[in-house]
Amino acid sequence: MARSIWKGPFVDGYLIKKVQKLMESGKSEMIKTWSRRSTILPIFVGFTFSVHNGNKFIPVSVNEEMVGRKLGEFAPTRTFHGHGADKKIKRK
């Protein structure tokens, strides 16, 4: 079920503070975060976030198409190594 519109998008408060601080200073640093649950806001466009995937931090550079989605959607947590090979021996 989707989040109620009257509640608005969820974003951790410290993320907004970090983005505003970087906007004021004019620096383009990578913002390190564990908050995969935060929604991407329009003020995040142009910034690069390091999103934790449970093992390491994945760099995610935000563009306009990402607005409204979650940060965690762009840092996959599982790696697919392919399906197992067929172990049956084929006879001629």
Curated annotation (Swiss-Prot):
Xref: Gene3D superfamilies: 30s Ribosomal Protein S19, Chain A
TM annotation in the entry: none
InterPro entries linked to this entry: Ribosomal_uS19, Ribosomal_uS19_bac-type, Ribosomal_uS19_CS, Ribosomal_uS19_SF
Lineage top rank: taxon: Bacteria
Pfam families: Ribosomal_S19 (PF00203)
GO molecular function, one term: structural constituent of ribosome
Family: Belongs to the universal ribosomal protein uS19 family.
Keywords, ordered alphabetically: Ribonucleoprotein, Ribosomal protein, RNA-binding, rRNA-binding
Organism: Rickettsia rickettsii (strain Sheila Smith)
Gene Ontology biological process terms from the UniProt entry: ribosomal small subunit assembly; translation
Functional description taken from the UniProt entry: Protein S19 forms a complex with S13 that binds strongly to the 16S ribosomal RNA.
Ribonucleoprotein keyword on record: yes
An annotated GO cellular component: cytoplasm
Name of the gene encoding the protein in the UniProt record: rpsS
Keyword Ribonucleoprotein: yes
Name by which UniProt lists this protein: Small ribosomal subunit protein uS19
